[in-house]
């Protein structure tokens, strides 16, 4: 009897131990599966965050081309239509022996429409070449003048010295050569014809920085432009013959932010400030005339919209903050699919 009771007690304890051990093992397995699920969810969230950040950057870069590059071998063709309105007054004077002669004030209200095709090619993953060809139409409502002609073609490159790292600031260095293929303002009669170009060759360099702080992209850029001296001119201005032009050097700074309305739509707000040194005109009679240094400022807004998985359209609007800036700017750009073409 005593042995039977001991066996029953022993079996009872063994049963309890087995049940307790099974419960512990079951709970441990459930916790392990839960931890694995949490780890998978965490990894999935990180992957989704990287994808959404990249989408935001793509929409932003479509609006701000200075901050974007193509992969090696990549090609893109972009069409843009820009409108600007400038209203000012031009004063032509001739000063002889401290006496002002031929004083002439010419009011001007110019509407400009520019159709541009820009082609980009990725030489390396961090180096992109680009070319831009504009066709400009201008109207002066005060003088009843109009012109449609090519503008100044330009060629440039964009280079990222550091590899792209999600979440880190992106640095882009750019350089552009602008030609004088447009109608020069120094080779026409300003009273009878309008210009579509700058009249000189110029070289510009710039540095751009952007950083994604979802849902905001902060960006800023600093650039400088130098225009080469233009000789061999023969333009009559204020009773004198213009022979040489030395345009001043210019500097520009812009900064702003792009806010993500969604991962397919972003609104960019930026301001730009420019400073240009004096421009000197040399005439055939040995005299010269210089314009004062100028400061220009503008406020710009742009909306980038992803209309399909591979196409982002950009609409922009801006206005001048100083007298030397354009009164009004508007534009729209749209990429053209050239995937079927190979070179």
Q: Model-predicted segments: where are they?
A:
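Outer-membrane beta-barrel biogenesis signature
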Residues: 32-95, 340-343
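Residues on the lipid-exposed face of transmembrane beta-strands in outer-membrane beta-barrel proteins
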Residues: 77-81, 117-123, 131, 155-159, ...
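Outer-membrane pore/translocation modules
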Residues: 137-138, 144-242, 290-291
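Detector for outer-membrane/organellar transmembrane beta-barrel domains
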Residues: 72-88, 192-283
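Transmembrane beta-barrel strands of outer-membrane/channel proteins
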Residues: 79-85, 131-135, 173-181, 220-226, ...
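Residues that define the transmembrane beta-barrel architecture of outer-membrane proteins
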Residues: 111-115, 146-153, 169, 197-203, ...
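Short loop/turn motifs that connect adjacent beta-strands in outer-membrane beta-barrel proteins
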Residues: 34, 65-74, 109, 126, ...
């Amino acid at each position: 009897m005593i042995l039977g009771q001991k066996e029953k007690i022993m079996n009872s304890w063994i049963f309890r131990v087995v049940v307790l051990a099974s419960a512990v093992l079951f709970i441990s397995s459930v916790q392990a599966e839960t931890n694995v699920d949490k780890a998978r969810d965490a990894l999935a969230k990180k992957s989704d965050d990287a994808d959404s950040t990249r989408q935001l950057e793509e929409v932003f870069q479509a609006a701000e081309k200075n901050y974007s590059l193509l992969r090696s071998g990549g090609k893109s063709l972009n069409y843009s239509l820009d409108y600007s309105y400038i209203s000012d007054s031009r004063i032509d004077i001739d000063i002889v022996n401290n006496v002002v002669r031929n004083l002439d004030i010419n009011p001007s209200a110019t509407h400009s429409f520019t159709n541009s095709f820009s082609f980009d090619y990725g030489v390396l993953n961090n180096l992109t070449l680009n070319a831009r060809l504009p066709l400009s139409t201008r109207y002066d409502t005060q003088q009843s003048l109009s012109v449609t002609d090519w503008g100044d073609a330009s060629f440039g490159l964009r280079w990222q010295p550091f590899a792209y790292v999600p979440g880190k600031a992106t640095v882009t260095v750019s350089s552009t050569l602008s030609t004088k293929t447009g109608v020069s303002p120094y080779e026409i009669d300003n009273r009878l014809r309008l210009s579509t170009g700058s009249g000189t060759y110029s070289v510009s360099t710039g540095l751009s920085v952007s950083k994604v702080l979802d849902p905001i992209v902060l960006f800023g850029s600093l650039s400088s432009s130098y225009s080469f001296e233009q000789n061999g001119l023969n333009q009559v201005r204020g009773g004198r013959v213009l022979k040489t032009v030395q345009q001043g050097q210019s500097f520009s700074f812009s900064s702003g932010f792009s806010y993500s309305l969604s991962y397919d739509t972003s609104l960019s707000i930026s301001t730009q400030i420019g400073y240009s040194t004096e421009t000197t005109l040399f005439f055939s009679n040995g005299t010269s005339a210089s314009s004062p240094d100028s400061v220009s400022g503008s406020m710009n807004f742009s909306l980038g919209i992803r209309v399909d998985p591979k196409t982002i359209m950009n609409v922009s609007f801006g206005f001048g903050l100083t007298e030397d800036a354009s009164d009004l700017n508007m534009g729209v750009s749209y990429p053209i699919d050239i995937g079927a073409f190979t070179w």
